[in-house]
Amino acid sequence: MTLDLSKPATAGYLSGFANEFATEALPGALPHGRNSPQRAPYGLYAEQLSGTAFTAPRGHNRRSWLYRIRPAAVHRPFEPFTGPQRLVSEFGDSADVPPTPPNQLRWDPLPMPVEPTDFVEGLVTMAGNGSAAAMNGCAIHLYAANRSMQDRFFYSADGELLIVPQQGRLFIATEFGRLDVEPFEIAVIPRGVRFSVALPDGDARGYICENFGALLRLPDLGPIGSNGLANPRDFLTPQAAYEDREGAFELVAKLNGRLWRADIGHSPFDVVAWHGNYAPYKYDLRLFNTIGSISFDHPDPSIFLVLQSQSDTPGVDAIDFVIFPPRWLAAEDTFRPPWFHRNVASEFMGLVHGAYDAKAEGFVPGGASLHNCMSGHGPDADTFEKASASDTTKPHKVDATMAFMFETRTLIRPTRYALDTAQLQPDYFECWQGIRKHFNPEQP
């Protein structure tokens, strides 16, 4: 049996966010009533994968038990990866991380590679903060690839990977089963989980937030109530599926921002059954239940929060993943686009599809922008003039769009690559220079 990534998956998914799942690809493969029997069914090995400390409170404790053909320890020693090394995980001053300018920054899309390039080879770090070694902060990567991973498997020991495809579907095989992910969906691969990516559409491009800190979770809803935003039932986790395949394969590991490779003589997708609450998942952003004002004013963008990584300060997240999906705007006597803003947090934005309602030009699908702590930003001149003159007695639908934001409590530091790349737009600041003075002290 193999996980055939040449065609779409046929198996269904398990529904729910961080549930205690139990799934088996062969009947009776899950031990009954215990985790580590003296002899596991079918001659399998029992292995625990821990995503949190053993002593984490039960409501926050994340782990899974895997029943596999060979333990994860079975591979040759690691050595430095000889392919592209464009990843950064430490965001203090260094050759890879120059001083962070206070300028507003914006980039054109990462170009598709000319040479054959798989998902691992196509990764490049644009920005980040904190430290993978200290397990705090994040790294923001882009990927651009044009071939499937062939007999190569990958995992990150540095953090969980929040993957946002912008172009091209991803068929992702993992130790836990398979995820098929398309633009408008996201996938989260937990720290340490081995996976491989096939590209059924050829070219693929997208964004990744690698979370070094506390695991992503659904936000509390407060006075919104018991439903709304991203609903737990819409998060999908793979059912167990395995392959028993031997050969000359390569295992690539990311540790402290560096890539390492090891020879492995079998496929690590040999998990026949598993149970637990630490597993990959995907979510369709089109299912997000958008909340907004039906009287006046534009609420804070926290109403668009999909997932959060909490910090040690109550109410202050280390990372927020926010989206700006299609939605109705109905507020009267209100400037409806996102307002002008300076933020104590830092904001890295991307665009999956369409146009962002605060920027009429220049911010295109696959592109990105960075507005760091206290850098002024907001709608461009054309957007401001149009929105200031629009008829707000009638509702308006923002349609055919999907923008998102990685917002962090600490400064997002662009890498040397991000500041030197030809995709950096040198004239981004010009979008605000046409904003006119309207002040008239004689006319309130």
Swiss-Prot record:
Its EC number is 1.13.11.5. Its cofactor is Fe cation. PANTHER family: HOMOGENTISATE 1,2-DIOXYGENASE (PTHR11056:SF0). Pathway: Amino-acid degradation; L-phenylalanine degradation; acetoacetate and fumarate from L-phenylalanine: step 4/6. CDD domains: cupin_HGO_N. It comes from the Bacteria. Involved in the catabolism of homogentisate (2,5-dihydroxyphenylacetate or 2,5-OH-PhAc), a central intermediate in the degradation of phenylalanine and tyrosine. Catalyzes the oxidative ring cleavage of the aromatic ring of homogentisate to yield maleylacetoacetate. One of its GO terms (molecular function) is iron ion binding. It catalyses: homogentisate + O2 = 4-maleylacetoacetate + H(+). This is Homogentisate 1,2-dioxygenase. Homogentisate binds at Y356, H377. Belongs to the homogentisate dioxygenase family. The active site is at H298 (proton acceptor). Disulfide bonds: none annotated. Gene3D superfamilies: Jelly Rolls. GO terms for biological process: L-phenylalanine catabolic process; tyrosine catabolic process. Keywords: Dioxygenase, Iron, Metal-binding, Oxidoreductase, Phenylalanine catabolism, Tyrosine catabolism. GO terms for cellular component: cytoplasm. Hexamer; dimer of trimers. Fe cation binds at H341, E347, H377. SUPFAM superfamilies: RmlC-like cupins (SSF51182). The gene is hmgA.
